[in-house]
Amino acid sequence: MLQGHERSITQIKYNREGDLLFSSSKDQKPNVWYSLNGERLGTYDGHQGAVWCLDVDWESRKLITGAGDMTTKIWDVEYGTVIASIPTKSSVRTSNFSFSGNQAAYSTDKAMGQNCELFIIDVRNADSSLSEQEPTLRIPMVESKITSMLWGPLDETIITGHDNGNIAIWDIRKGQKVVDSGTDHTAGINDMQLSKDGTMFVTASRDTTAKLFDSESLMCLKTYKTERPVNSAAISPILDHVVLGGGQDAMEVTTTSTKAGKFDSRFFHLIYEEEFARLKGHFGPINSLAFHPDGKSYASGGEDGFVRVQSFDSTYFENIFE
C-alpha cells in the first residue's frame, strides 16, 4: 500500500525492469516508488495542475508528464529536474514515449475553444529549447477528442482511443489516419495497454466492457463484459490473463460499502473471456492498473489516492483452466 498522494491517482506505470513504479495524481506531484518494498524515492515538483498522464522511457532516464496546467514536461528520472517544459493551449490528456525513446507524443483536450490535437516531438537532445521548437508533426482531431494513446510497432504509427469509443491508427510519416475501428465500443475509451509483444492491446471503456484488439488491423478479438464502467485494463506478460478495474464515475460514487464489489480488480481469462478472480482493496473506483513486467504482481491506483501493489500467490500460477 503506497501512500503519498493527497488526491486521486490518474495513472501508474512501471519502468521496463519493473524496479520503479511511477504514479501521477490530481495533486500536481507525480511520484516514483521502489516497487519491491513500496519506498517512495521522490516526487517531481513543478506542475501547477492535476497531472493526467505519465510515461517513462525504455532506459528509465526520462519521464514525460501531461497536466491540466497546459504543459507537457520532460523530467530527468534520477534527479527529478525538469529537462523541458512545453506549453500547450489546453490541458494535456495523454503522453507517451516511443519505443526507441527518440520521439514522444502527447495530445491536448478539446477545451477553451481549442480543438483536440496530437503532437509528436523529437526528444533525442531534449533541453529547455524544446519549448520553442515546432513539433515534428501535429494532427488536429476533428471528430472526438483523444482519451488514450499507444505507439504502434517500429515507431511508425500511433493508436488513439477516443471519447466516442472510436479507435484509430495514424501513420506518423504521412500524418493521416490509416485504420479506423468503427464502433466496437459505444462509449469513451478510458485506457489502452499493449500486450508484451505488442501484437494486440486491451481497451477499457465507459460502455462497461474491455476488448482485445489486433494492433495492426484493429480487429476486435475478445470482449470482457462487466456491469459498470471500466477505467483501466492490463494484459499479463506471462499468462493469458487480463485484469480490469473500474467502478462508477467519481461523480456518481456515494458512500456504498466496499462489500458491493464495485471497486474490485477483476481477472478474466484472455482467451475464454471468463472471470475467474476478484481482488478487493480500494475504497473507490480504480483509475489505473499495471502488471509488473515479470507478471508476478500488479499495481492499482484508485480514486482514494492510494496505490496498491499486490503479489500473486502460487495458486494463481496453477492455471485453473488447464
Curated annotation (Swiss-Prot):
InterPro entries the record matches: eIF3i, WD40/YVTN_repeat-like_dom_sf, WD40_repeat_CS, WD40_repeat_dom_sf, WD40_rpt
UniProt organism field: Drosophila virilis
Coiled-coil residue spans: none
Name under which the protein is recorded: Eukaryotic translation initiation factor 3 subunit I
Similarity comment: Belongs to the eIF-3 subunit I family.
GO annotation, cellular component aspect: eukaryotic 43S preinitiation complex; eukaryotic 48S preinitiation complex; eukaryotic translation initiation factor 3 complex, eIF3m
Protein function: Component of the eukaryotic translation initiation factor 3 (eIF-3) complex, which is involved in protein synthesis of a specialized repertoire of mRNAs and, together with other initiation factors, stimulates binding of mRNA and methionyl-tRNAi to the 40S ribosome. The eIF-3 complex specifically targets and initiates translation of a subset of mRNAs involved in cell proliferation.
Known partners and oligomeric status: Component of the eukaryotic translation initiation factor 3 (eIF-3) complex. The eIF-3 complex interacts with pix.
Each WD repeat, start to end: 4-43, 46-85, 141-180, 184-223, 281-322
Cellular compartment(s): Cytoplasm
Location (main, coarse): cytoplasm
